[in-house]
Amino acid sequence: MSKFINAAAVTLLATSAIADGHASSGSVDAGEQQFKRQCVACHIVANTQGEVLAGRNARVGPNLYGLANRQLGAVENYRYGDAIVEAGETGQVWTEEAFVAYVQDPTGWLREALDNNRARGKMAYRMRDAQDAIDIYSYLATLGVASETAGTGLN
């Protein structure tokens, strides 16, 4: 539970930066480095033409192209767990706050978001540092275009 409190504190600070007009509050450069260290084993970022922009063509996790402010669990041809699909169907999108909390405790975040103690996330990796997660979100926000309708589209 303390991870949620820490994540909430960091994202509260981040939210004030976003409210001031910033798309995200982290360092894009630091996020790129952390993505290379922590995410590439499972994820890629490939554009709509299939060009890999980041990652090693991993197939364990979904493509993270256009992640920022997109619906959870909606990348075509990826087999998500039921809980993350359900979260997306309730209108959840990848905001900085949601991303930071999720990557620190995927199952815990889904259980809280869905108010369902049986919900489980498929992502086994947990990011330890909230600032790393904020930076990675900032980096991912630069890769891809926002969906035409907020809250819809690919994850």
What feature does the model see in each segment?
Residues 131-151:
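C-terminal partner/receptor-binding element of secreted or periplasmic proteins
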Residues 46, 71, 106-110, 144-147:
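A general structural signal marking secondary-structure boundaries and capping sites
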Residues 16-36, 44-54, 60, 151-155:
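Electrostatic cytochrome c docking/interface patches
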Residues 50-55, 76-95, 104-132:
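Axial heme c-ligation environment in periplasmic c-type cytochrome domains
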Residues 2-10:
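Sec-dependent signal peptide recognition
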Residues 50-76:
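N-terminal, post-signal-peptide region of Sec/Tat-exported proteins
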Residues 33-45, 62-66, 100-104, 121-124, ...:
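C-type cytochrome heme c attachment motif
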